[in-house]
Amino acid sequence: MKIGIFTLPLVNNYGGILQAYALSRVLVGLGHEPRLINLRLQRSKLSIAYIKFLVACALKKELCGAKFNPSYERDTSEFVSENIPLTAPVCTPADLKALCEKKRFEVVILGSDQVFRPSYFADFADCFSLGFLPPNCTRIAYAASFGGDRLCGLKNPADLKAHAANLAKFKAISVRERDGVKLARECFGVDAHWVLDPTLLANKEIYDKFLSLAPQRKGFAYILDPSPRSEAAIELLKKQRGERPRQPHRHKSMVKRYCGRGVCANRLISRLRIFHNL
């Protein structure tokens, strides 16, 4: 079955890249032919919300001692082109509609990642509910996320009504966070199921080709939002193991130590190796 995957432009977000990779591999394993719809954004037209998001990430890295590496964009682009099946670049909503008509996808999957946050789509903000698809194309949302505890970026009641009507045409809708079930009902009037993120849905074998064993197995903590509770858990692990777990940004040399053979040329792959070598 020919399946299109419609998610946020991948930019340099390794989490977004990995979820797209994982979902495409799961679909291939089920015997389908997936293609990620290759949304391309002109830097001058990135949404204010997404620019703020990228700036916040950069500031967080700077404050934590991480250095900006201009090769990161090249590395992530290389990973995407080599490991995720892509369509031709799509630069405008008109191009998007034309591509889907040409490819004749039998199914288009919305997700994963924060696809229910339309401002993150920039020029494609009005497309997240897949209203551009022909009537005979099956629509599915998998592990979609609102990116928070409320709907952001839709203030016009008419726009909200139009997107709700589009989402009502979906054969199935699922969300990444438990709160998303309630938000989907309140915001769009649709029923949604709570499911695994694609990175956890896939078997570990899809990551094996990127991984190499480190000389030693050590503790590793990946904390999105540090809190007293998470710090207490880390301290407990420190007492049990006799050393503090490594954390991204907390220790500059963390990637080098965990990759076994030095820093991998592709930092996204380095991250995978870190998780594998625990």
Residue ranges and their predicted role:
Residues 1, 101-104, 133-136, 207-218:
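Nucleotide-sugar donor-binding and catalytic loop/hinge architecture
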Residues 140-148, 179-184, 223, 230-271:
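Catalytic donor nucleotide-activated moiety binding site of glycosyltransferases and closely related
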Residues 150-155, 200-213:
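Acidic anion/phosphate-binding donor-loop and adjacent secondary structure
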Residues 170-177:
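A short beta-strand/loop micro-motif in the catalytic core of glycosyltransferases
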Residues 7-14, 18-165:
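Aromatic- and Gly/Pro-rich donor/ligand-binding loops
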Residues 104-107, 171, 217, 276:
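Conserved acidic residues
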Residues 192, 196-199, 204, 255-278:
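Donor nucleotide-activated moiety binding/catalytic core segment of transferases
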